[in-house]
Regions:
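Conserved "HGTGT" condensation-loop signature of ketosynthase/thiolase-family condensing enzymes
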Residues: 1-130, 149-152, 168, 177-197, ...
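Short beta-strand segments
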Residues: 90-93, 134, 159-165, 207
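Internal active-site segments that recognize and position negatively charged phosphoryl groups
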Residues: 146
Length: 207
């Protein structure tokens, strides 16, 4: 496999800190937290302290919508043609559309991550079948490694890599069952730390 220089191109971050990469960096630089305490009976009982995408600004934020927004922005900003034979797409997630299982009488096809990824790719005009990486918390890094290897192998000339996960009833219940969710904003290196803060968001970039 050839050792060639591979560069990062356009990017977009959608999170509780902002809807663009610039907004996120400004929030981080200014010490503005994305984590807040709120109530949402559709997610869990009682209060939850977590990072949530601002629906008032973004609109309906589901797994596929977030991916389409981020990937579409990267393609538009970079000028990359999703239809070009050398353009690849790698999508990373831990749970994908797991919320589609809620109260479903039968499995929704979108519950299968590969199916959901293909729907996103088709709507954005990609001709290549998307590669899906779902390997817990390392999914995003693994997706970047896979994309780099696709370029080194000559399979693609450029690859858009995207990752997304949502705050869902399933995810929150899972972490709460481990007693690992902090009741306040997490303090990861504090002697009195009491857990983590969950969050949702989506990021995409071009290799």
């Amino acid at each position: 496999m050839a050792q060639i220089a591979i560069y990062l191109g356009a990017d977009r971050i959608i999170s509780a800190c902002g809807l663009t990469t610039r907004e996120n960096m400004e929030a981080i630089g200014g010490g503005t937290p994305g984590v807040a305490t709120f109530r949402d009976p559709s997610l869990c009982e009682g209060e939850l302290t977590a990072g949530r995408v601002d629906r008032a600004r973004f609109g309906h934020a589901d797994f596929e919508t977030l991916l389409e927004a981020a990937i579409g922005s990267v393609a538009a900003e970079s000028g990359v043609d999703p239809k070009a034979p050398g353009t690849g797409l790698v999508i990373a997630t831990t749970k994908g559309n797991i919320d589609c299982l809620r109260n479903a009488p039968k499995p929704d096809p979108r519950c299968f991550i590969a199916e959901s990824a293909q729907r996103v790719a088709a709507r954005l005009g990609f001709t290549a079948r998307p590669v899906v990486i779902s390997n817990a918390c390392i999914s995003g890094v693994a997706a970047l490694v896979v994309a780099r290897r696709m370029i080194e192998a000559g399979t693609c000339t450029e690859v858009i890599v995207a990752g997304a996960d949502l705050l869902t009833e399933f995810v929150i219940a899972g972490f709460r069952s481990f007693k690992s969710v902090s009741e306040t904003v997490c303090r990861p290196y504090d002697k009195a730390r009491d857990g983590l803060s969950l969050g949702e968001g989506c990021g995409a970039l071009l290799l």
